[in-house]
Amino acid sequence: MHVQVGGLKDLILSCRIELARDMGYAAARYGHVMFPENAHEPALRCAELLLGGIGKDWASRVYYSDNGSTAIEIALKMAFRKFSLDRGILLDSDKSITNERNIQLKVLALKGSYHGDTLGAMEAQAPSAYTSFLQQPWYSGRGLFLDPPTVFIRNGTCALSLPQSIQNCHLSPGDKCFPSLADVFCKSRDSSAAADLYSTYISQQLSEYSVSSNIEHIAALIIEPVIQGAGGMHMIDPLFQRVLVHECRDRKIPVIFDEVFTGFWRLGVESASELLGCLPDVACYAKLMTGGIVPLAATVTTEAVFEAFKSDSKLTALLHGHSYTAHAMGCSAAVKAIQWFRDPSTNSNLDFDRMKLKELWDGTLVNQLSSLPNVKRVVSLGTLCAIELQAEGSDAGYASLYARSLIQQLREEDDIYVRPLGNVIYLMCGPCTTRDVCTEQLSKVYHRISHFNPIH
């Protein structure tokens, strides 16, 4: 997608060679290890880095799996067990190991979310193109799915959009427009009219599940913190998600952060929980955890959740595993990638004092892009820059081919491989990609969109 020159190119090449060497050593040294009742050095080192980094001050346990969707399945099992114990649902140990189903456990989630393609992960997301009968005939949607407020840049202004389900008559213009993206994350908003509005809305939605005799329970909150990925690259108002977490804490509903997409510097910080200003009970990581080199995932959780599975009976344990759980090559890649991203000597984008990435996308160019008449919104955060094109009817949405001529031009004439999500296109650089490269790519995208004339 791009070429880097000089010393930085040599440094990145050196790091990649070192990563490949470590993976090769792990393959030769360990081969395949059945992880139950075993451990090896790469898995131990990776767990230490996870708990000392993204899990610092809240997590104490790591459960490995092979991909993000499976990490979500494990997280759901963890949250449901914790909820069931806290509510006294599993008091009778004899019944707890049978297949009796006298209650229904559901999730609280957001419309537009995406948590993976395995069956349980799909049940935890609202109806979408991914869950249609063509894709998943078993889908029923076991959750309460809320329509979230979103934040975006349009005409150079950072704005808040509220769904119809949330009444906005009490919000002033100052609550719906922000001088900068940093103001969106400001904790002073916790005492705003918007926070009260969100709290009332969420409480009303949860009220039908508050009756103690109800057989249906909201047993977990699962969200993609800040950015919804495959659902369209929407930025959810962080205040809404923060209030959502607070309301669930008050009701002893375990909180899951799906950071498969957002984790490990994707949004400019190591964990999106830093942007939200609140912590989960369970969080899932994959993708950039290994630098994108090989599949590996981790479900990270608290000691309290771990305790929910302790027992003298093996049947009470978390019986979820794979042949390639904590495979040594993946753990070695993760160790190297995590260290690489956190070290300013190998990641020149890292502001080590603040433990944040420097701004990668040129703000002036982003604002100019958002002001084009054929652009509906722009989301620019960390390594991500997403653009939604103005489109109506069948030209909008995931199934749309509206942007295909634009995509073809970018690929064939500009050497930029842009993946579309319907009428949404996006750029994602690496955490170590230089700002100059990002500006070069975004300038080409701006030029193409400014001359874009879709062919139907």
Please place each PLM-identified region on the residue numbering.
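Conserved N-terminal phosphate-binding loop of PLP-dependent enzymes in the Aspartate aminotransferase
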Residues: 1-456
